[in-house]
Amino acid sequence: MKKQIKTAVILMLVGGLLTAAAFLMAFYTAEVQTFGTVNLTKAQAAASNTVFEVAPANLQPIDGTINYLRPWLSQKIFYFHVPLAEASFLIFTVAAFFAIMFLSKRRKSFDTKSRIAMEVAFLFVIATMITGDLWTRASWGMWWDWDPRLTTYLIMMLLMLVYFVLRNSIEDEERRAMYASVFCIIAWIDAPISFFITRIIPSQHPVVFNSGMASSNLVPFIVAQVGMIMIGYAIYTLRVGEEQSRERLEIIKEAIEN
């Protein structure tokens, strides 16, 4: 247990340092890129009171809408927001994996690991939504838009919320674990949909790996991604250790009382 906690603390520290370093690189060494333009109708531009710089004439569409250059601030949020979102998908996948393991093996430890992974994934989803709102405001001039990526990600957050409500509404431990595992797997289907939807149907949300990132931008992005995953794994490991300690104490307490 001590080794597990020590490993988690080291991962947390290294992950925090990598994330901080990536954010500093984003401000001081990364090339400022506009990541293209954002397209708004005249009504949207007026409603959002946008102050974005109008894109050059050769980038203007012929359908009457207006293209604006994305401001530099959206690029800085990008180094924090995208790694959070990628980590949330990954941790959600871990939760679904342990849910499948529980249904096949019926071992309580798999349900515990699935629940804790869901807790960590939910934490990352909330952080992604907050930074995403800041990005949306900076990039599109509005706090929210029913864009396919945003909508499917919001659905994913709500499904996670329902997962915890479901767990708390069932008293029987075995039934609770079984229903929660089934729901976790069904809810996880939304994760790949949300991840790939910008590649399938038209969306304002940029596709990161098709954005032509310069090497000075790619390095801090990868560093931030690694750091964020390390932080996520550290939180997960600490929570698993805490839960295992609590379960051991309950076993000892029951043994003493009997």
What are these regions (language model features)?
Residues M1-N258:
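Polytopic transmembrane helical bundles with strong interfacial aromatic enrichment
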